[in-house]
Amino acid sequence: MAKEFSRTRRIGQQLQQELAVVLQRDMKDPRIGFVTVNDVDVSRDLSYAKVFVTFFEEDKDVVQEKLNALIAAAPYIRTLVAGRMKLRVMPEIRFVYDSSLVEGMRMSNLVSQVINSDKAKQQQFGSVDDDVIENDIEESDDTEGKV
């Protein structure tokens, strides 16, 4: 039976916190810029850590350049984090761009556009009266009882 808070999950959470601090304070590479560590998935044997990151930029080319800079700096980042954590073996860090935040924002914008479009159509053509809706409901109830 799996524990609620497994060791790999606790190490992943600590690694996420330490990576955020290292990337914010210790990394001076201007190519990386502002980066957010969303999640860290550590393998069961603690040999690999998949780090999900997002950037302030939305342009795909700029995001890819920043991700490549992080991948190139991964060994250096690993040594900085290893000095801050008490582990016998520090996991190999693999950076992965997390597009879920961008996709969530895109979906939210689409929903907002549809809502605004519906409101505009409602104002343009007028709203349906509540009496008409109630009459339709009553008529459908009457026909269901007669069947």
UniProtKB/Swiss-Prot annotation:
Q: Which Pfam families match?
A: RBFA
Principal localisation: cytoplasm
GO CC, sorted alphabetically, is:
cytosol
Report residue spans for region: Disordered. 122-147
Q: Which GO terms describe its biological process?
A: maturation of SSU-rRNA; ribosome biogenesis
Q: What spans are recorded as compositionally biased (Acidic residues)?
A: 128-147
Which keywords does UniProt give here? Cytoplasm, Ribosome biogenesis
Q: Which GO terms describe its molecular function?
A: ribosomal small subunit binding
HAMAP family, A to Z: RbfA
What does the UniProt function comment say about this protein? Answer: One of several proteins that assist in the late maturation steps of the functional core of the 30S ribosomal subunit. Associates with free 30S ribosomal subunits (but not with 30S subunits that are part of 70S ribosomes or polysomes). Required for efficient processing of 16S rRNA. May interact with the 5'-terminal helix region of 16S rRNA.
Q: What is this protein called?
A: Ribosome-binding factor A
* Lineage of the organism: Bacteria, Pseudomonadati, Pseudomonadota, Gammaproteobacteria, Alteromonadales
Which gene is annotated as encoding this protein in its UniProt record?
Answer: rbfA
